[in-house]
Amino acid sequence: MVAVSLKKIFFKQKTAYEIVHAVSAFLLNRSSDLDAHHVFQLLTGTAGTIRLNHLWQSPFTMHSNLVEHIRTEARNARAGKRARIIAKMNALLEPTIIEELYKASRSGVKIDLIVRGVCALRPGVPGMSENISVRSIVGRFLEHHRVYYFHAGGDDVLYLSSADWMDRNLFRRVEVAFPVLDRTLKARVIKEGLQVHLRDNASAWIMQSDGEYVRKPSRAKEQRVSQVELLGRFGT
């Protein structure tokens, strides 16, 4: 058994007050144990490159796995099946990933990207990215988790990771993405790690096709602020 943890951090600079929300998974199978073992062997220099069973690892397999999952959604969309990608990260710059997302959008995949910082992708461009939305949520607290979701024909593939979709993270660092396999936990991560941010109608800035961000006033009576919701659940 191996426990893999990814921390979600809320940090208020003025008061130096930190709230840490740990997103963790206990991987209860032999192949996952071996995956973690091989990662630590690599870090200590006692093993070479080994293809892992469940974990994605930079700089070896993470990029190719991301590309393949994006392409799978595109194939499903072209076949008339439901296709969906939701991803949350701090930065999106890697050219191949961006091009694959454009191709997936042209194939009909609905893509929602929650990118806190720099994003080189342009959503809503006619003939290229009409099916892509990009939002940035910059509130009082720093959020540091990355979540990748692929509909995968109804299998709901979900990974938690340390890696932004940038060249440095995917090719020049050792980073890991691990799957959430339990259906109950998977549904909870989708709800608390992704959907809560997509529902945010008060602090989200929406990227336009020219790269400008617009904060549209909400017409809803209820103001939904994702960080307030999360603090209500996990804060003190």
Task: For each feature predicted by the language model, list its residue ranges.
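Polybasic, lysine-rich low-complexity intrinsically disordered segments
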Residues: 8-9, 14
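Mobile "lid/hinge" segments at catalytic clefts and subdomain interfaces of large enzymes
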Residues: 30-45
